[in-house]
Regions:
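N-terminal cap/leader regions of alpha/beta-hydrolase-fold enzymes
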Residues: 1-231
Length: 231
């Protein structure tokens, strides 16, 4: 079942797309967008998670700047629009919005109160920030840009964390990837997987660098991780 809800956050209200599984109660996964907003790709990801037995909740992260952003990943104009939103985005405020979304998901009547966060690109960074600053049951990061700038916060990580990095990612350099791996190697509850030959957003539906084999491997690891940590 698909619906839209309103989350009452610390700084105001914002919308979220919700996909529910057939069988409840169920654990929840907060799904965090790229620069394209809660678009068709993010909604499809939520629907797939619901089919696997999770309540998927995708909050509108850009609500302070522009509500209900829904951009086409194949449009250059939309890419430039999303990039402008990304460059002006307040990451600290965004992490608090994610914290508020996690709290709202846990309070849903059909939720078991177990909540993970999963994010892509900007959403991947916010997943990392949420995991090191606040309480979540599990975290999954897909190619979180600029994560290397926040590695001094890794000591705050308590929840299990799974990270996916494309080795050829044009937005996350090899030195940045090595720094991320080194920092997380000190955390026994963190696992980082590298995907040879893969670029940024290799797992994104309809993305320019989509690779079905690598995406299936990464997503399979994600689904197994979520089932183990949330059930």
């Amino acid at each position: 079942m698909k619906s839209r809800i309103v989350i009452e956050g610390h700084a105001g209200s914002f919308g979220a797309y919700v996909a529910r599984p057939r069988s409840v109660p169920a654990p929840a996964v907060v799904v965090l967008q790229e620069v394209f907003g809660v678009n068709a790709d993010i909604r499809q990801t939520c629907d797939e998670l619901a089919a696997l037995g999770f309540i998927a909740v995708a909050p509108d992260l850009f609500w302070r700047q522009e509500r209900d952003v829904d951009l086409d990943v194949r449009s250059e104009a939309d890419w430039q629009h999303g990039l402008r939103l990304y460059q002006a985005y307040d990451r600290d405020a965004g992490a608090k919005d994610v914290r508020d979304t996690v709290a709202a998901a846990a309070e849903m009547p059909d939720c078991t109160r177990k909540v993970a966060v999963l994010g892509y690109c900007l959403g991947g960074l916010l997943t990392f920030l949420t995991a090191v600053r606040y309480d979540v049951d599990a975290a999954v990061v897909y190619h979180g840009g600029d994560t290397e700038k926040y590695l001094d916060e890794v000591g705050g990580l308590k929840a299990p964390l799974l990270m996916h990095l494309g080795e050829e990612d044009e937005f996350i350099s090899r030195p940045a990837q090595e720094a991320i791996k080194k920092a997380l190697s000190k955390k026994p509850n963190a696992a980082v997987y590298s995907y040879p030959g893969q670029y940024h957003a290799f797992s994104r539906h309809n993305g320019a660098h989509y690779d079905a084999s690598a995406a299936a491997l990464a997503n399979g690891r994600t689904h197994d991780f979520l089932k183990r940590k949330l059930h």
